[in-house]
Every structure is written in C-alpha cells, then in structure tokens.
Amino acid sequence: MSAVIAPRPTSRFSLRNELAAAGAIAARDVTKLLRDPIRLVGGLVFPALFIGVLGGAFASNFESPGIDLLPFIFAGQLAQGVWQSAALGLISILEDRENDFSQEIFVAPIGRRTILAGKILGESLVAFPQAFTVMLFGIVLGIPLTAAQVVALIPALVLIAIFGASFGALVVSLLPNQRSANLLFPFIFLPQFFLAGAFNPIRDLPWYLDIVSHIAPLRYAVDLIRGAYYGVPNVAVLSDPIWNVSLISILTVVMLSIGTLLFVRSERNR
C-alpha cells in the first residue's frame, strides 16, 4: 500500500504577501498626503518660505568667513525638511492604532515588522515632494544647483529619509499614544535645528553645546547633504561624506532594529 503524502501547507506569511502588504501601507500614506491639501501645501510652501525669508535675512545681516549663507541654509533646510518629515510621519502609526484603521491592519495576517516597514517606506516617499520643492525654490532664488549636484543629492536624500523614519520609529515605539508624541516631538526636533547647523555654522560652539551637537542625529544628515551639494572640501562641510554615510547607515540599522523590536513587543502586549 503506497504511502499518502500530505501536501505541504502554504504559509500565510509568505515573503510575497509581506512585500505586497508593506507596499499597500506605503501607498496608503502617499494617498493620504495627496488627499490632504493643507498638509500638502504647508509641507511644500513652508520650507521654501523658510529659505527665502530666513535665508535672505541671515545672508543680509550676518557674515561667516568662507561661507555663502544662502546656499548654506538651502542645503541645511533640504536635509532638515526631508529628515523631519520622514520622522514626524511615523506618528501616524499611533493614529492608526487609535482609529478604525487599526482594526483592519493590526489584526491582518501580516507581521508587525511588515507594518512598520510599510510606514517607514511610505513616510520616506512622502518626504520627497518637499525636497523637490526646496530645490526648485532654490533655483528661483538664484542658488547654484547643477545637474551633477542633483544627481549627488538624490541618493543622499534617500538615505536621510530612511534615517529620519528610523529615528521616528524608535521614538514612536517608546510612546503610548499620539498625544504623547505630539507633546514630545517638538522638544526633540527644535533644539536639533540649531545644534545640527541647519541654519547656522556650528564649528565654534561652546564645548558643552558641541557635545550635544554630536549626539543630535540631524547633524549628520545636514552635513551629508552639504557634502553632496558642495562636492569638494569646503568650510561648510564638517566631516567627510564617506564618514557620514557610514555613520548614518550604522545608526539607521541600530535605531530600526531597536524600534522594530520595541514596536513588536508593545503590540504583542496590547
């Protein structure tokens, strides 16, 4: 009598299903942006006005040896805008947890890591319209921006978008609800705008502020974008771009690993 071989059960958690789910979550975040005109216009106009008003005021009233402040602030705002947009976007995962959408996504047959990966991908994509708007406005203001610089900036922007989203994932994984995130995030981001050198040179900071500046993740995102923009050794660039890429990559992996672990654990305990 021949043995009956039972068919191998198919896994509900196949790689294809997980990738499709992550893509759907990312597409949902992009669609939400397109359907929210206030958020879309604010995200596009505010950085441009920041460069035009703040950059113009700084360039007219302050001098820094060897640094043209308008391109300096342009590169800083480009980095800060993408990094902050990607990081802040992760707050939406707390919103999803609290509304009806959570009943659909958090009980779906997909891994919690897939949910987080989809949110990170989606918010990274959402950050790019702002980046291209800043570039276009920079050209309008007469800031030099060549095709070679754009080619160098795009991969750097991709990296810092993922870097920012990973930072946001780590912070969000430690918070219980959206209200806590809305209260905490301004205290995390606002000091970094100045300590990271997004708007001002930071080579001559007092020693205690210099220590805090080196702890700020945004510092390395800003410096990487300036390295890609200037393309050659420049007084505006603090560290070698290769060093910044290496450090950002390591920090991204560490923050993403810890954030994912904490997020999965918190969801299991709910």
Task: Please name every model-derived segment.
Residues 64, 144, 193-254:
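Membrane-interfacial helix-loop-helix junctions in multi-pass membrane proteins
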Residues 2-8, 229-235, 245-270:
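Junction motif at the cytosolic side of a transmembrane helix
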